[in-house]
Amino acid sequence: MNYRLSNNNIDILFRTEPYTELCYFGKRLQNFQPEMIDMLYPAVPNSRIDVNVPFTLCPEEGLGNFSTPGLEGHRNGKDWSPVFTTKEVNKTDNSITIISEDNIAKLRLTSFFILDKSGVLQCQNTLTNLGDETYQVNRFSITLPIPERAQELMAFSGRWIKEFFPHRTKISHCGYLQENRRGRTSHEYFPGMMVGTEGFKEQTGEVWGIHLGWSGNHRIQVAVKSNGKRFIQAEALYYAGEISLAKGESLSTPWLYATYSDEGLNKMSQHFHQFLRSNIIKFAKNKARPVHLNTWEGIFFDHNPDYIMKMATKAAQIGVERFIIDDGWFGKRDDDYQGLGDWYLDERKYPNGLEPVIKHVKDLGMEFGIWVEPEMINKNSDLYRAHPDWLLELPGYQQPEGRHQYLLDLQNPAVFEYLLERLTWLLSSYNIDYIKWDMNREIVQPGHEVNPAIVGQTKTLYRLLDILQEKFPTVEIESCSSGGGRIDYEILKRTQRFWTSDSNDALDRQIIQRGMSYFFPPEVMGAHIGGALCHTTFRELHMNLRGLTALFGHMGVELDPVKVSEQEQNGFAYYINLHKQLRPLLHSGNFVRLDVDDNLAMQSYGVVSQDPKEAVFIIAQLTLPTYALSGNLRLTGLLADKQYQIEVLDMPDNIDPKINGHVMKELPQWMKDTTTLSGDWLMNVGLPLPVLDPATAILIKVTTK
């Protein structure tokens, strides 16, 4: 039997007898008939297996498939090469569930595919042990074929304070393999990538995008077989002996999210953004994302309630809507060497409790938030002195420190109950609207008792967050992991915001936030205006670039508002107010990135309303322009037959020749006065760009008349 999943843009075709194959994933087909799928049976070449070798949902060596199998495992050395035959298919309008079995190996494979109206395909495999003996699983993946014309790959690498930096490579015989073994989603290898036709861009080319929703170790590969067939394979990465299934037990892969675009990366991103907005993001749609002030870069561990209330007063005056006390409020947390795990209020710093501070914040009309890092412990803590056996470690080995801290074993029932009790106390005792949930180190030798435990640790974290969300449904949670070390769709099901990076350097943030935008919409991307001197790079940047960079996310600020100059306060207030004016558009529209000619020196992106009657775009000059003039900027996403009025909302102080003349003697004509041009002109001819200094930006808005 042949089956089809379809929406207005995408078709996914299956052949299920005797083995299930996903035969096509791409542009919607016109005048489709199910029997057409049979035309996809290929030629059988000489000097190979004498029959067609199907490429199934879980590729099997036993069928003559010499690529990486979808399942590797055994039952005491037996049943190591299963072959799954289709037994049952259940189809609805937007989903298909396929049950396949190997009666010899006594294994069942259940494959789930759901095609959302956004154009995102959700895929998952589940393995069930039907035999009497335990089945040891070494690897278990979800596999998607891609066409031969997918010649190029774009993925993301990075490190702390440098997340989501893109890189491209040609897909050749050796393929591409990405592994993350750091115990969290990681800064180094985001579990998502795109493959596409050679030279695919933001607005052109065919693109297939995938993301593995998993917050632990992962492996993703793009492979090319000797017959030219290509595939993507994604999975949670297991330690040796980590996963075994007793009779009747099941194991599921993480959900894989995939989509197709025939209009470049922008359309791919819009599919992912629409999917998240409709299915995963959990804050009230009618509630604006409040502007944050986090105290960390203002006071670090030096907590004084009277001074913090002064900070809150100043914060409210510049337009802050959510005030967050960061690290240092609990235990004897005077530095990062001590106190983690002691989730009791530090009465030395807060002799009257947190209530006076919270009341002051609320009276100013702001929400109140607080920082926690529940998964961690310092050895210099009351908790460790009482329970040294609560660490996540392998007995007999010396666990290395990371940022002076260690991990708690969440699978230990006593640890889980302690954390649940302390967090319940915190959220029940105080009027808290938001918690920043941090996780500040990588995981080495993660042993639960003597067994490897990353999968269990990750799933138990999910369970803890699920319970807290059920008990406190109005409390929002931010996922932070030394910045962007835990950003993925599965953790987003339990949180409402990501701390994108510990870097507030606006030049680096331009690249980091652009990279994140391929998979996540602006409203979940924490983007703060930092101080003039960035604490991670020691670069000093103008407020213009800092403010406009933070504008395109869930805005916040990092400062001590009591100490900054009046000029800086005015700058923060200006960009906060500008963000609030544009927030309804920024957090509901279609995010677009523009292809610019001088893409090493400049980048441009924006948000277009769903109508699309209005849009806002930033042009950010990162380095010195390659040429004296930067050419024309062609916009995207507009209505060709509509007239748009163009307005410059923000630009550097030194750009106007009448005032300064530092970079230009004449502005481009469209910047001299109110200009109206057609969408067709703006998208095909474009606007001549002004000359900009490095580390500056302009913001323009276009609106239909």
Which residues fall in each region the model found?
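C-terminal beta-sandwich/jelly-roll accessory domains of carbohydrate-active enzymes
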Residues: T623-K705
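Active-site neighborhood of glycoside hydrolase catalytic domains
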Residues: P351-G353, R385-H387, L391-H542, H554, ...
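Carbohydrate-binding surface patches
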Residues: N9, M194, E202, D597-L639
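Polysaccharide-binding surfaces and accessory modules of carbohydrate-active proteins
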Residues: M1-F14, T20-A223, Y239, Q643-M664
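Conserved, mostly hydrophobic/aromatic
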Residues: N9, N125, G248, L293, ...
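Glycine-rich, aromatic-flanked loop segments that form ligand/cofactor-binding clefts
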Residues: D50-F55, E60-S81, T204-N217, T259-F283, ...
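Short Pro-Gly-centered flexible turn/kink motifs
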Residues: F84, I243-D262, A695-V702
